[in-house]
Amino acid sequence: MIKVCVIDDHAVVREGLKRIISENPGMAVTAEASDGQEAMRVILSEPCDVVLLDLTMPNKNGLDVLKQLHSESPRLPVLVLSMHSEDQYAVRVLRAGAAGYLTKESAPAKLVQAIRKVVRGGKYVSPTLAEKLVFDLDSKSSKAPHEILSDREYQVLCMIASGKTVTMIAGELGLSVKTISTYRVRILEKLNMKNNAEMTRYAIKEGLVD
């Protein structure tokens, strides 16, 4: 029996995933959490074979949870299931230790296929993402400007470009307004930009926001 832990802040999503998984012999959702902090407690107290992890959550975001899991339980496969398109986060989460990446629009059959593959020790990416990864390896010298940003800076960039204020971002990430403002300044410096409008135009042009 494949034991699955589902981490998502939306109850309707968790219920949908439980239904999909329960319809497949040999696997079941045995634990769930609604935010990042709860996720770490649940995973430590209720061992599982694979984690389905959302990225955008309150208290502790998915990327931070992923990094902590990879550090503390490197053999536990984490399959990121996100509303964000592959272009936005897939490469970063794979570098951070994820075993695979799927968007929430993916067909249920692909989700089940991905779960079985990562539990066996494999990696799951879509053909499109696999092609992008190969292309990136062949063109390291021509990286996009935003690829020099740290994961946190990249996250703040995407949130600003989505129309969120520094105060809103601080609340969602559980950080101080001063800290988010510092990240904003670093982003502007690294991308050689002057204001939020330029960051937003850039993010839209590069497909970093929907």
Regions found by a protein language model. Give the residues of each.
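The feature encodes the CheY-like receiver
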Residues: 13, 58
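Short amphipathic alpha-helix used as the core "switch/output" element in two-component signaling
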Residues: 41, 63-75
